[in-house]
Amino acid sequence: MQAHLSANDLACRRGERLLFSGLSLSLEAGDALHVTGPNGVGKTSLMRILAGLARPFTGSVECTGSIAMLDERLALDTDHTLRDALAFWERLDGACNAAQMRAALGLLSLLDIPVRYLSTGQRKRAGLARMAGQNADIWLLDEPLNGLDTDAQASVAGLIAAHRAQGGICVIASHQPTGLDIPQLALEPMR
């Protein structure tokens, strides 16, 4: 199966405020897209619409393949060790390459530490490992580089490149530069 993600003439409204309209995109296996724009312009709303977690005001989304999403809510139980918190999700998600993702993101030395003691960047890397371990065809990454140091950002870039090389699709929403040579979709505030 070839991954595919497209959106046709999307509009998003929050209350009486129109965040964006007329948004269309089409991504095939190996493609990536960087959605940019200032805070509050609708980047997260677009990601939630693409993931099927929110309905567009108008328009439609078509998807072939499985979707995994990373957002600001990492859903890691702070009362458990990182090992146990990740194991919980690995059982639910059916993660098949979780150990590989833990190693790739430098988490092996942190597995026995309670999540509440991890830094923001360490928690973000754990969330990325959880998401990548799902082996989904389409990755939706909402602000994936927030809180990451230069080495961790390079690790994430490597994971994204490997995912694309295997036919995966990646959509990154961020107001930060990604360091990746991929097309950009700039969302602008509606007037």
Region spans (language model):
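Conserved ABC ATPase "signature" region
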Residues: C96-L111
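Conserved ABC ATPase signature
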Residues: P114-R123
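Q-loop/switch helix immediately C-terminal to the Walker
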Residues: R73, T78-N97
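Conserved structural motif at the start of ABC-family nucleotide-binding domains
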Residues: L5-A7, L19-G22, L148
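Helix-to-loop junction immediately C-terminal to a conserved catalytic motif
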Residues: A51
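Catalytic Walker B motif of ABC-type/P-loop ATPase nucleotide-binding domains
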Residues: W139-E143
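Hydrophobic anchor residue at the start of the ABC signature
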Residues: L128, G167
